[in-house]
Amino acid sequence: MGVGPWFYVENAILDNFKYKGQPHNIEMKVALANSGDVQIELIQQTNDVPSMYQDFLNSGREGFQHIAYWTEDYDAMYQHLQDKGYDVVHEGQIGGPQGRMAYFDSEHAVGIAIEISELAGSKKQIFDYIKKASIGWNGSKPIRKL
């Protein structure tokens, strides 16, 4: 398939997580890999706080839950989606204050949730590292801890 290597985080920390405006402490395991310019995320929420991940599973679905758009102009994209009528359902930060992300309620319009992800700071460095590791990957060490 040309996907790999996978980078695994046992306890991904999502700071300032909010679901429908209410703060919660979400716990997750995450694996990331690239196939060319496309990053694939495998996310397993390990507690039962409310989130769009829980909403998706509780509705009886599984599989492809969201598509992410990376941006270096997070505030403008956030405002653009709100101006288009999409509501933020959950949001938080990963990798510090420049690692903001938000999931918008877009399932009625496009069939899946839209995530915007700020591509800056340590998160950008990690995403670049994962992409670079995928270029010419020979299949060795398919699972690596981040």
Label each region the model flagged.
Residues 96-100:
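Short acidic/glycine-enriched loop/turn segments that link adjacent beta-strands
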